[in-house]
C-alpha cells in the first residue's frame, strides 16, 4: 500500500517537488529497483487473453518475460538497474499482511461468482486481485538477472528501505518503486512508473524529498509523522483526519504526540494500543543492507545459459531470446559512457535540464534537518 494519498498530496501542496521525464533522460544513471513491486506489475500486465503467460507445464512465465524485456529496455536507454528483493517483513507489518489475506479470500469468492455469471470483465478484475509474488517468482527472476549480467541484492527486510539507503549513500541516483513510503524511509529521489508497460505511455515521475520538506516546512521526523497520519502499512491512522487536515495539524503542532494531546478524543479517537512510536522508529531507523559493503557490477549476458533456462525450461522462443541477448549486449557498449554531470559536483535538489526555481527566504534554515533520519552520508 505504501502511504495513502501521499502522491496526490505532494502534487497538490508541493508540485515543484515532482518532475516528469522521458526514460531517455536517465542515460548513465544507476537506479535501485524494488524487485517485488516490479514482479507484481509484470504478473498483472504481461498477459494473453486476460490470463498470465504459462508454459506447457502450466508454470507462470509472465514475470520472466516482463523482467527480461523491461530490463533490456532500461539498459537500451542507458539506465543501469540494480534490483533489490524483499527480506523478512517487519513484525509491524503483520496486521497489514493479515488484511491482504482477507482481501484475497474475498476476491476468490467474488471471482467464483463472476465466473458462474459469465461476467468476463469482473473475472479479469478479481483474477488480478489474487495476484501474489511468491518465493518461486523471486528465485526465478534472480536466476534470470544473474544470467543477464544484472546485479541484484537481498534486503534484510523491506526492499524500499534498502533502496533508500543506497540512494542516501550515493550508490545509485534514485529508488524506483510505486510505493511512496520509499520517501518516508528517506530516499532523496523516488522514481515512479520506470517499469510500467510502454503501452501505458506513462511519463516517469521523479519526487525530490528535499523539495517536499522545503515546500511543507517540515523536517524528516515531522514528514514521517505526517505519513503515519495519512496511513501506512505499519500502524493504523486516526480516523477522520484527511490529507489536508493532517498537513495543517503537523505544520501547527510539529509532532503526532502534540497533535494527540490537542485533539478532541470524542471527535478523533486514537486507535487502541496505537503503534505509532514503533512505526516512527521503523521509518527512521529501518533494517537495511550496508551500502558500503555493496559492489555493483554489470557484466556480459550468458547467452547459452539464458537459452537453456528461458527456452529449454520455460519454453520461450529461442529466436526472440537470442534477439533480446543481442540487444542487451549492444546496450552495454553504449551504457559504459557516463553522464557529464557525474564528473562535477551537483548542487541543489533538482539536478536536471530544467532550471531550478528560486528558493523562498528562510528556506536554508528549514533544510537544515533534511535527511536527519538517514544513517548514511551521501557519496561523492
UniProtKB/Swiss-Prot annotation:
Positions of modified residues (N6-acetyllysine) = 80, 354, 375, 377, 380
Give the cofactor binding note.
Binds 2 magnesium ions per subunit. They probably participate in the reaction catalyzed by the enzyme. May bind an additional third magnesium ion after substrate binding.
User: Which parts of the sequence bind Mg(2+) 2?
Assistant: 179, 181, 233
Q: How is it modified after translation?
A: Acetylated by EP300. Acetylation inhibits both endonuclease and exonuclease activity. Acetylation also reduces DNA-binding activity but does not affect interaction with PCNA or EP300.
The enzyme's E.C. designation = 3.1.-.-
Per the record, the coiled-coil ranges are none
GO MF entry, a single one? 5'-flap endonuclease activity
Keywords of the record, alphabetical order, are: Acetylation, DNA damage, DNA repair, DNA replication, Endonuclease, Exonuclease, Hydrolase, Magnesium, Metal-binding, Methylation, Mitochondrion, Nuclease, Nucleus, Phosphoprotein
InterPro entries found in the cross-reference section: 5-3_exonuclease_C_sf, Flap_endonuc, HhH2, PIN-like_dom_sf, XPG-I_dom, XPG/Rad2, XPG_CS, XPG_DNA_repair_N
Q: Where is this region: Interaction with PCNA?
A: 336-344
PTM-bearing positions, type Symmetric dimethylarginine:
19, 100, 104, 192
Q: Where are the Phosphoserine residues found in this chain?
A: 187, 197, 255, 293, 335
Cite the binding residues for Mg(2+) 1. Answer: 34, 86, 158, 160
Q: Where is this gene product found?
A: Nucleus, Nucleolus; Nucleus, Nucleoplasm; Mitochondrion
SUPFAM superfamilies assigned: 5' to 3' exonuclease, C-terminal subdomain, PIN domain-like
Ranges for region I-domain? 122-253
User: Has UniProt tagged this entry with the keyword Nuclease?
Assistant: yes
Instruction: Name positions with the PTM Phosphothreonine.
Output: 336
Instruction: Give the region (N-domain) as residue ranges.
Output: 1-104
Q: Where is the composition biased (Basic residues)?
A: 363-380
Region called Disordered, residue ranges: 327-380
Tell me which GO cellular component terms the UniProt record holds. chromosome, telomeric region; mitochondrion; nucleolus; nucleoplasm; nucleus; protein-containing complex
Q: Which PANTHER family match?
A: FLAP ENDONUCLEASE 1, FLAP ENDONUCLEASE FAMILY MEMBER
Assembly, in brief, is:
Interacts with PCNA. Three molecules of FEN1 bind to one PCNA trimer with each molecule binding to one PCNA monomer. PCNA stimulates the nuclease activity without altering cleavage specificity. The C-terminal domain binds EP300; can bind simultaneously to both PCNA and EP300. Interacts with DDX11; this interaction is direct and increases flap endonuclease activity of FEN1. Interacts with WDR4; regulating its endonuclease activity. Interacts with POLB.
Biological role = Structure-specific nuclease with 5'-flap endonuclease and 5'-3' exonuclease activities involved in DNA replication and repair. During DNA replication, cleaves the 5'-overhanging flap structure that is generated by displacement synthesis when DNA polymerase encounters the 5'-end of a downstream Okazaki fragment. It enters the flap from the 5'-end and then tracks to cleave the flap base, leaving a nick for ligation. Also involved in the long patch base excision repair (LP-BER) pathway, by cleaving within the apurinic/apyrimidinic (AP) site-terminated flap.
Record-given protein name: Flap endonuclease 1
Q: What species is this protein from? A: Bos taurus
Q: What is the lineage of its organism?
A: Eukaryota, Metazoa, Chordata, Craniata, Vertebrata
Q: What would be the name of the gene that encodes this protein? A: FEN1
Amino acid at each position: 500500500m505504501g502511504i495513502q494519498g501521499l502522491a496526490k498530496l505532494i502534487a497538490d501542496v508541493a508540485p515543484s517537488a515532482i518532475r516528469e521525464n522521458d526514460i531517455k533522460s536517465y542515460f548513465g544513471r544507476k537506479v535501485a529497483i524494488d524487485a517485488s513491486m516490479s514482479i507484481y506489475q509484470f504478473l498483472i500486465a504481461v498477459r494473453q487473453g486476460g490470463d498470465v503467460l504459462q508454459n506447457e507445464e502450466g508454470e507462470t512465465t509472465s514475470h520472466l518475460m516482463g523482467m527480461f524485456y523491461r530490463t533490456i529496455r532500461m539498459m537500451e536507454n542507458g539506465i543501469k538497474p540494480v534490483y533489490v528483493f524483499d527480506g523478512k517483513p517487519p513484525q509491524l507489518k503483520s496486521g497489514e499482511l493479515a488484511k491482504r489475506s482477507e482481501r484475497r479470500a474475498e476476491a476468490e469468492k467474488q471471482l467464483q461468482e463472476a465466473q458462474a455469471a459469465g461476467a468476463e470483465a469482473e473475472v479479469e478484475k478479481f483474477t488480478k486481485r489474487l495476484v501474489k509474488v511468491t518465493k518461486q517468482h523471486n528465485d526465478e527472476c534472480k536466476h534470470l538477472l544473474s544470467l543477464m549480467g544484472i546485479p541484484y541484492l537481498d534486503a534484510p527486510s523491506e526492499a524500499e528501505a534498502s533502496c533508500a539507503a543506497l540512494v542516501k549513500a550515493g550508490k545509485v541516483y534514485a529508488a524506483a518503486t510505486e510505493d511512496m513510503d520509499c520517501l518516508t524511509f528517506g530516499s532523496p529521489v523516488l522514481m515512479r512508473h520506470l517499469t510500467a508497460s510502454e503501452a501505458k505511455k506513462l511519463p516517469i515521475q521523479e519526487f525530490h524529498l528535499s523539495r517536499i520538506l522545503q515546500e511543507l516546512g517540515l523536517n524528516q521526523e515531522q514528514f514521517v509523522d505526517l505519513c503515519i497520519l495519512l496511513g501506512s502499512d505499519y500502524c493504523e491512522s486516526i480516523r477522520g483526519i484527511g490529507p489536508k487536515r493532517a498537513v495543517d495539524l503537523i505544520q501547527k503542532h510539529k509532532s503526532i504526540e502534540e497533535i494527540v494531546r490537542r485533539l478532541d478524543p470524542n471527535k478523533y479517537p486514537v486507535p487502541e494500543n496505537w503503534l505509532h512510536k514503533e512505526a516512527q522508529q521503523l521509518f527512521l531507523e529501518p533494517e537495511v543492507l550496508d551500502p558500503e559493503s555493496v559492489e555493483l557490477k554489470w557484466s556480459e549476458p550468458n547467452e547459452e545459459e539464458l537459452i537453456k533456462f528461458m527456452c529449454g525450461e520455460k519454453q520461450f522462443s529461442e529466436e526472440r531470446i537470442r534477439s533480446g541477448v543481442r540487444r542487451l549486449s549492444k546496450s552495454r557498449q553504449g551504457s559504459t559512457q557516463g553522464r557529464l554531470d557525474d564528473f562535477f559536483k551537483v548542487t541543489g535538489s533538482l539536478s536536471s535540464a530544467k532550471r531550478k526555481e528560486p528558493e523562498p527566504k528562510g528556506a536554508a534554515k528549514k533544510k537544515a534537518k533534511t535527511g536527519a533520519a538517514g544513517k548514511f552520508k551521501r557519496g561523492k
